[in-house]
């Protein structure tokens, strides 16, 4: 088993996948990682859809991606994860009205990081996609109006594991006590 530091260091945005099914047992492991993620007041606002059926995944990809950034590479992924937030939760509505903070986005970000690190741990690759057309995705997947599609994540066995991309030094992005 790899350490957390190794998983954080090894995680990459994968854009080329093998034509290989992701086993249901591995999807269950990812679901468990999501389930254990912390959230504001333990509200667990995320609703995650694993689209594994090829015909449906292809429709989600063709109808949901496009526009300025078409992300055509996403079609090679055997699984498309559709990450949604339940917007009708009282805790999150209160926080947004009082503090102007969208806690559902913070919560889902934490949960999805659990997912991508677990995916890395079990030999799977992922890539976040933030540019998509929500309306056709909601229609194709019968997503309720009270849910917001926050992002998509491709999932599968990497055909190519990309090299690490340059990162800013820690002293440029972190501060102790004052800026």
Predicted feature residues:
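Short secondary-structure boundary segments
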Residues: 85, 131, 157
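Small-aliphatic-rich amphipathic alpha-helix that forms the alpha element of a beta-alpha
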Residues: 34-35, 81, 96-140
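A structural motif
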Residues: 27-35
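Glycine/small-residue-rich phosphate/adenosyl-binding loop
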Residues: 42-111
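A glycine-rich helix N-cap at a beta->alpha junction
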Residues: 70-80, 142-164
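C-terminal helix-cap and adjacent tail motif
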Residues: 4-14, 23, 89, 151-179
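Alpha-helix/helix-capping structural signal
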Residues: 12, 55, 132-135
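Short secondary-structure junction motifs
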Residues: 43-46, 124, 150
């Amino acid at each position: 088993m790899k350490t957390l530091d190794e998983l954080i260091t090894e995680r990459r945005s994968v854009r080329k996948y093998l034509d290989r099914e992701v086993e249901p047992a591995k999807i269950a492991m990812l679901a468990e990682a999501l389930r254990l993620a912390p959230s504001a007041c333990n509200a667990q606002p995320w609703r995650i859809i694993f689209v594994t059926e090829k015909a449906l995944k292809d429709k989600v990809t063709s109808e949901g991606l496009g526009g300025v950034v078409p992300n055509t590479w996403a079609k090679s992924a055997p699984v498309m994860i559709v990450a949604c937030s339940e917007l009708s939760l009282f805790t999150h509505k209160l926080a947004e009205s009082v503090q102007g903070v969208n806690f559902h986005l913070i919560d889902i970000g934490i949960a999805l990081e659990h997912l991508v690190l677990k995916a890395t741990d079990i030999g799977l690759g992922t890539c976040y996609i933030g540019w998509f057309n929500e309306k056709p995705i909601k229609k194709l997947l019968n997503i309720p109006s009270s849910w917001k599609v926050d992002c998509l994540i491709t999932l599968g066995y990497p055909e190519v594991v990309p090299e690490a991309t340059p990162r800013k030094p820690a002293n440029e992005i972190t501060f102790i006590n004052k800026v």
